[in-house]
């Protein structure tokens, strides 16, 4: 049974088998969690879809993993601050509406 994509083709895209396994697993988890696909797929399973993306060159290993982690942390913190500000505005609006209602 011939597997598609072949291991040889995939190893042309990453430096080692270890890197391939890690990249494939991480991307498969992302796809399972609802990350947008970079292409149409032939396969049904997320692991094989991840391998298809690696083969096509749409998914690669980040050259600066610590930089990527920091960018993700910043994005999460920014999203958290935005949500907190939004909640604060909603609470202020509710308080204002209550106050206006009591004046009538």
From Swiss-Prot:
Keyword flag Transmembrane helix: no
Alphabetized GO MF terms: DNA binding; DNA-directed RNA polymerase activity
Recorded name of the encoding gene: rpoZ
Protein function: Promotes RNA polymerase assembly. Latches the N- and C-terminal regions of the beta' subunit thereby facilitating its interaction with the beta and alpha subunits.
Biased amino acid composition, Basic and acidic residues: 63-104
Oligomeric and partner information: The RNAP catalytic core consists of 2 alpha, 1 beta, 1 beta' and 1 omega subunit. When a sigma factor is associated with the core the holoenzyme is formed, which can initiate transcription.
Region annotated Disordered, chain positions: 53-104
Protein name (record): DNA-directed RNA polymerase subunit omega
InterPro entries assigned: DNA-dir_RNA_pol_omega, Pol_omega/Rpo6/RPB6, RPB6/omega-like_sf
Organism, as annotated: Streptococcus pneumoniae serotype 2 (strain D39 / NCTC 7466)
Transcription as UniProt keyword: yes
